[in-house]
């Protein structure tokens, strides 16, 4: 009994400085963004061109429309309502997302790509609800 207490005391004094799994937590905004970007690329299909943008005239942006949609979905998934908080958190990921756009550009492009975002969401729901099921689902 005394030996167990001594071992527990030793373990209680140990301090974890860095978790090994810290990089892969689901509140990691970049991890969620990367997963949603891959899903959006698979689902978008013919809605976007090879660079991930809706076909339109003008300069091709470095931060694609699919990346804007994925960033929007990631911020909603994490529960970030404020754009200032979103861009404050994104400063931690400047290395991972080098072509990040400004808040003003994000707002403008998010409004432009809102229909694309809705279509991708509808296709996601269709994939989840109907395509992977063999029997009808009761709602």
PLM ranges: what are they?
Residues 2-139:
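Short alpha-helical elements
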């Amino acid at each position: 009994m005394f030996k167990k207490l001594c071992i527990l005391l030793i373990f209680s004094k140990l301090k974890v400085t860095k978790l090994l799994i810290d990089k892969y937590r689901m509140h990691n905004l970049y991890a969620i963004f990367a997963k949603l970007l891959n899903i959006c690329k698979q689902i978008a299909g013919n809605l976007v061109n090879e660079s991930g943008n809706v076909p339109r005239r003008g300069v091709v942006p470095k931060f694609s429309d699919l990346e804007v949609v994925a960033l929007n979905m990631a911020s909603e998934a994490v529960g970030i309502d404020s754009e200032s908080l979103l861009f404050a958190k994104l400063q931690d990921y400047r290395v991972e997302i080098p072509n990040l756009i400004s808040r003003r550009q994000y707002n403008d492009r998010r409004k432009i790509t809102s229909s694309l975002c809705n279509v991708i969401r509808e296709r996601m729901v269709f994939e989840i609800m109907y395509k992977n099921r063999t029997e009808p689902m009761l709602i």
